[in-house]
């Protein structure tokens, strides 16, 4: 697999099989709203001021710059649980040293509001959130397409979704991973944060490709016979039987890495029949590789063979990255929707665990790329 020579953007496979659904989506502050959910309650004591902000059409970094210029706090002294996109309306939490609180007493900005403040003992760090609630409004939705949207949402709510990295990771032209590969091969870059981001894009690209291969396997296991699976994947009859008897869409593999969902530790799938029950109960999920020296290793069998198909040509760079694991299969929570036939608006709300992308879910529902 020569990533550098590819001229087209890789398109991961969908898990659902319906045809594309017609709807208009614009990622603006009225039609795309994100609300961050903290990982813990704020204590009410300590040296850090927690700001609950609402930003519109600003990146998190742009919001920090505005607050820095007003308060005098250096950008590096702010804390945040995650970066949020520029487009849309975002409610998120930031932290700053409490001693600068008075400088924000008369703060006013057309695109940035401080809604409330809290006191806490520590600075917010990346990952200090449970997840995000999303509101999405689709427009120009005909009644026939509204029915298709409802069915797609019910299917995703029942089976779960592919936890791909979203387009935000890969840049305007979808090729940030190529720059990450160049850096791993020795290209110099002074901007450390950009360097880390591009290498992360490389890891994310490989993750998406492996997950797409697992989605393909799951479709094949549903659609093909044991004999055909044996021929395609060069597996034993017993392995083919194990795939065929799994009723859920996303098939687990013996020897792959699993994790306690949504925050738990990694472990190997040794007893497939036992783990299937926990997977169906949403207590565990399969974890894909973010390549690196410290990532939990896959066992053996088909799981390792499929992983090697994607990662074998990049193992020489393994030592240059820390690595980790990411859930490949996630679940919608608190799902709601409503259709206004008169306005032709279809509104969707749901909660996702941290690290999951609402745009990935929306692309799965609509079966088309959002911003082409």
From Swiss-Prot:
Keyword terms, alphabetized: Isomerase, tRNA processing
Residue ranges of the TM segments: none
GO biological process: tRNA pseudouridine synthesis
Gene3D superfamilies assigned: TruD, catalytic domain
E.C. code: 5.4.99.27
UniProt name for this protein: tRNA pseudouridine synthase D
Source domain of life: Bacteria
Top enzyme class: isomerase
Domain TRUD intervals: 160-330
GO MF entry, a single one: RNA binding
Residues annotated as catalytic: 85 (nucleophile)
Reactions catalysed, as given in the entry: uridine(13) in tRNA = pseudouridine(13) in tRNA
General function of this protein: Responsible for synthesis of pseudouridine from uracil-13 in transfer RNAs.
Native organism: Campylobacter jejuni (strain RM1221)
GO terms under cellular component: cytosol
Family to which this protein belongs: Belongs to the pseudouridine synthase TruD family.
Positions in coiled-coil regions: none
